[in-house]
Amino acid sequence: MFKISFLVLGLMLLMTRNTQAGEKSLYDFLWLDPDKKVYVLQNKLFKKEHTFYADVGYMVNFTSKFQETSGFTGRAGFYVHEEWGVELMINSYNNSNNDEFRNVRIINAQEPFIRRLNSSYAAMAIWSPFYGKINTFNRIFYFDWSFGLGPAKIDAESNLKSVTQGDVVTTFKKESYTGAILKTNVKFHLTENIHLGAEYMNTYYRAPGPRNPKSDRLRTNTDVILSVGFSF
């Protein structure tokens, strides 16, 4: 999952490299005379430098095989530069057993190993190098594409001890980890102050598992988030 996440980010950067055109970028028009040069003006309608923003969002988790997990996220940030900002984030998760969990419990007469996140907190650096617009028949939609990375505090719980001891009915113990969050976000501007967001977020941390309860391994938690926010 760790390699796949960076592969996805790499492909996204490659596909969108043209959206980083500056206001004085040179464009090649083959139908012009060779000695002609054309510059396309890319004026930014929605400036980010020295602006605050706050978002709330709904997230869906794609990590656990045995849990239905969703939740809510809130974040606030400030752009110190047109391309660079800082952000504080809080995520809250709701977990429930799914059909896979119930099937395993019925067939094997034992519950599977589960680790589920309850909440996470992060302080992130935001890099927003890409911007662009989508032309429709009667409206132009402007967007920014950003990336975020920062340390995170993760509150979770698992039934690791019960599973390794072979208990029929498991109990969950609270756990706490320090890790990191890596994400990418596309923000669509509806007005000067209101925007919608779509985000892909990975949470990384090290934790033990049932195969080797005394050894930590890198774990990944993946969320997709839809959000709404305002800036000023």
For each feature predicted by the language model, list its residue ranges.
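Short glycine/proline- and aromatic-enriched beta-strand/turn motifs that initiate or cap beta-hairpins
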Residues: 21-77
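Outer-membrane beta-barrel "beta-signal"
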Residues: 23, 121-127, 219-232
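Extracellular loop and loop/strand-boundary signature of outer-membrane beta-barrel proteins
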Residues: 41-42, 60-61, 107-113, 165-172, ...
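Residues that define the transmembrane beta-barrel architecture of outer-membrane proteins
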Residues: 50-52, 68-72, 117-121, 143, ...
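Repeated loop/turn-to-beta-strand initiation elements of outer-membrane beta-barrel proteins
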Residues: 52, 83-88, 132-133, 188-196
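Transmembrane beta-barrel strands of outer-membrane/channel proteins
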Residues: 56-60, 72, 78, 88-92, ...
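Outer-membrane beta-barrel translocator domains and adjoining extracellular loop/strand segments
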Residues: 68-71, 99-104, 138-139, 158-167, ...
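Gram-negative (and chloroplast) outer-membrane scaffold detector with strong preference
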Residues: 87-161
